[in-house]
Amino acid sequence: MAVRASFENNNELGCFAKLTNAYCLVAIGGSENFYSVFEGELFGTIPVVHASIAGCRIIGRMCVGNRHGLLVPSSTTDQELQHIRNSLPDSVRIQRVEERLSALGNVTTCNDYVALVHPDLDRETEEILADVLKVEVFRQTVADQVLVGSYCVFSNQGGIVHPRTSIEDQDELSSLLQVPLVAGTVNRGSEVIGAGMVVNDWCAFCGLDTTSTELSVIESIFKLNEAQPSTIATNMRDSLIDSLA
């Protein structure tokens, strides 16, 4: 299911929220409408948490995370860190990172298995990313853009990349990520996909300007019409049992 929303009339919804299969962070402030859109879709499946990071409301651009963990910049205050820790499931590891490229959401993007990162990201940050988020890390560009988190969004089901990504690059990225990809836009033609939407394995949220065509592409590539949290959990449990057998 894909849902349209805006934060104080701003359609760059991916700046103000962070969505994974285990939790959802939503920026503090503005109206309760923004929070209630997420709460309405996610209630009973994962916690939806009001948060700020380093005193900023653009939390989606400041952090990177998946169901295993969450990385935040070193400028995150102790109170913010403690609040997020208390609100997230115990299985989610949270860690502060000393990184020059501190807008982690712009320079990294990941699902539960693979991460793409800015070619100049610190080696130490890459190791922490692999350890805390339990992902394989690839230094990559998307359509020659180094801000992979801004121009690419993917879940465990599929992904959308910058509209000017060549077919060869799409194929290369798709084989790295092991998910189908499509070149597309959100918010009526915006190339900055990471800022315009958030997605997990059963739900997507995008800006109010997103057209019905863009919405149908999103629902199709992320397989949102087939997905429900319960079936995903069951599939994950079955595969886990198989791997342990």
Identify the residue ranges that each predicted region occupies:
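The feature marks the mature, well-folded catalytic cores of soluble enzymes
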Residues: M1-A245
